[in-house]
Amino acid sequence: MSSRVELPVPVEVDAPAAQVWAYVTDWERQGEWMLGTRVRVTGGDGRGAGTTLHAVTGVGPLGVPDTMEVVEFVEPTDATPGRAAVRHTGKIIRGDGYFEVVPLGPHRCRFTFTELIDLPLGALGRLGWPLARPVLKAGFVVSLRRMADRCAAAYRAADGP
């Protein structure tokens, strides 16, 4: 087994791609929908490549630091997908993460969150991955559903179909 693993999680959202993009790439609001995560922008404007981020993932005072750099930032149009890529640069969390927003018409889109994780702890990390994967995936599914519900509710309240 390689020490790099992939974990993609898609969700369909009843809101336009541009609205979903604006919400998911508002890095400091990520804690509103991503379980156990707090993020702050540490460099750049947060709206493009070169932005640096510091996140803490955990419960209460117990958390794992996660430093990142945005290496790609392409906003969606009505017809083309948007994509943001971050490189995890921390001591524990390393790898790449991707947000992709694909328009499915004027009022709907698909958001896919993908992590390409470099497993820590060598052989122990590889042995533990089959146990950790379903837990991480379940957390991401809950988080993405929360994000989708928030975006859909905001769209309906503002000017939805």
Give the location of each predicted region.
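Hydrophobic ligand-binding cavity/cleft-lining segments
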Residues: 1-48
